[in-house]
From Swiss-Prot:
The reaction(s) this protein catalyses: (S)-malate + NAD(+) = oxaloacetate + NADH + H(+)
Keywords recorded for this protein, A-Z: NAD, Oxidoreductase, Tricarboxylic acid cycle
Active site: 174
Classification lineage: Bacteria, Pseudomonadati, Chlorobiota, Chlorobiia, Chlorobiales
One Pfam family in the UniProt entry: Ldh_1_C
UniProt enzyme class: oxidoreductase
Function: Catalyzes the reversible oxidation of malate to oxaloacetate.
SUPFAM superfamilies, A to Z: LDH C-terminal domain-like, NAD(P)-binding Rossmann-fold domains
Transmembrane segments: none
Protein name: Malate dehydrogenase
Similarity comment: family membership: Belongs to the LDH/MDH superfamily. MDH type 3 family.
Length: 310
């Protein structure tokens, strides 16, 4: 198993180390355009092997040729939004980056599974799918796993229970339009509505929507990377081990939930072939409407890129 991670920033480097520590691949390649950064970080990780007890070969490179014949490619490259930069500016700049990255990936790997982490997540997943020509089941966005992890952690904190006992789904887009599904949220099988009043649940939902911003406000410079990296690696592990995990991931819908031809976060079954099934669960009228509104925002942004991608 060969896994390539594009982008040697905090998310990419942290994910690379977790992949190695879990021994999910024989070979991990960390690629970045900045000379020396991927090489230095990868060497540092590799030298931790005897202590962390892994034998994975990790190396860094500035050359996409080193990604040749990758089974899985994790894309974390892209710019963060800077002061004075509009969302449209960020969208266009990162579209150009992801277009170039995807072209290079496909130049050297015939049929990889691509996992997208770069923002705006849902749109960048669409870009990678459009440019790669891969089957939609093999281009997957990491959003719902992270948003769900935040939702679960906040519930566990409020109830003072183990995070492992929290079951939940956060669907829709990665951002203000995400849709935490309270109906399917439970604690060791007990519906959350039996343990928390509506106002507490609503507050947790709102905190989840602002989870990324909360971290940015603390850090002042930079953004979250431990939880995003862990979420991406959970997806990779499900694929590598063919675990058939049911996880909320961004995928292209073809009529499910009344959404067609748009990438949106929904429950899927993840296995060795990528997305093996989309689970069209029953949603309340409000939840379905919120999910469709979220998808409409993604579609609007994708439509604005047609000239760039053609």
């Amino acid at each position: 198993m060969k896994i390539t991670v594009i982008g040697a920033g905090n998310v990419g480097a942290t994910a690379s180390l977790r992949i190695a520590e879990k021994q999910l691949a024989k070979e991990v390649v960390l690629i970045d355009i900045v000379e020396g950064i991927p090489q230095g970080k990868a060497l540092d990780m590799y030298e931790s092997g005897p202590v962390a007890l892994f034998d994975t070969c990790i190396y860094g490179s500035n050359d996409y040729k080193d990604s040749e014949n990758s089974d899985i490619v994790l894309i974390t490259a892209g710019l963060a939004r800077k002061p004075g930069m509009t969302r449209e500016d960020l969208l266009m700049k990162n579209t150009a980056i992801i277009k170039e990255v995807t072209e290079q990936v496909m130049r050297y790997s015939k049929n990889p599974i691509i996992i997208m982490v770069s923002n705006p997540l849902d749109v960048m997943t669409y870009v990678a799918h459009t440019i790669s020509g891969l089957a939609k089941e093999r281009v997957i966005g990491m959003a719902g796993v992270l948003d769900t992890a935040r939702f679960r952690s906040f519930i566990a904190e409020e109830l003072n229970v183990s995070m492992q006992d929290i079951n939940a789904f956060v669907l829709g887009g990665h951002g203000d339009s995400m849709v935490p599904i309270v109906k399917y949220t439970s604690i060791a099988g007990i519906p959350i509505t039996e343990l928390l009043p509506k106002e507490k649940i609503d507050a947790i939902v709102e905190r989840t929507r602002n989870g990324g911003i909360e971290i940015v406000n603390h850090l002042k410079t930079g953004s979250a990377y431990y939880a995003p990296a862990a979420s991406a690696v959970e997806m990779i592990e499900a694929i590598v081990k063919d675990r058939k995990r049911i996880l909320p991931c961004t995928t292209m819908l073809n009529g499910q939930f009344g959404i067609d031809g748009v990438f949106c976060g929904v429950p899927v079954k993840l296995g060795k072939n990528g997305i093996e099934q989309i689970l069209e669960i029953n949603l309340s009228e409000y939840e379905l409407e919120a999910l469709q509104k979220s998808a409409a925002l993604v579609e609007e942004n994708c439509n604005s890129l047609q000239a760039v991608l053609s």
